[in-house]
Amino acid sequence: VSGFHSCQKLAFVIQAEVNVGTDRKAENAEAMPLDNPASSPFWETVPLAQMSQSQWESLCDGCGRCCLNKVEDWDTGEIIWTDLACRLLDHESCRCKDYTNRFAKVPECLQLTPQSVEEITWLPPSCAYARLRDGKPLLWWHPLLSGDADTVHAAGISVRGRVKTEVGVPIEEYEEHLVSWPVTETGE
């Protein structure tokens, strides 16, 4: 990566486990598309800041990309992704192994809120929160559109089969794990 000379250039490691709890496919009817096809689904009509908790949580597609470690180049400020996943990420389901206690176990975990989504610039372009923030539609593979939580995996959007655990990897070796696919592959 141009301008990324050594791990000593790293300003910090960014981790986030955001809304990657249990499968919420049918957890709450309020979060699901409306039964009346003439009506628009909530994500097209309700602003992010006005969504209920269940609506907000259902926007998470379960890709696990937000749970990848990221580094910042001190010289450029560029956020660079790694293929190293948070220690709590289940690599098969792409969900947090301890969603309820994630902040206690991973203090650097960031919670997505309507306010933080406005401020966080590193969300992947496939992320529903970022897409809706930017006035873009959900993509075809999103579980709210497909009705199937597995389409995120079938479309190759999730981190399944593409990541390693951060456990035991010193920050000095993060440079060996840099990847671009979290921000270049969207499934559009």
Predicted feature descriptions by range:
Residues 28-62, 71-188:
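Short loop/turn segments that flank or connect secondary-structure elements
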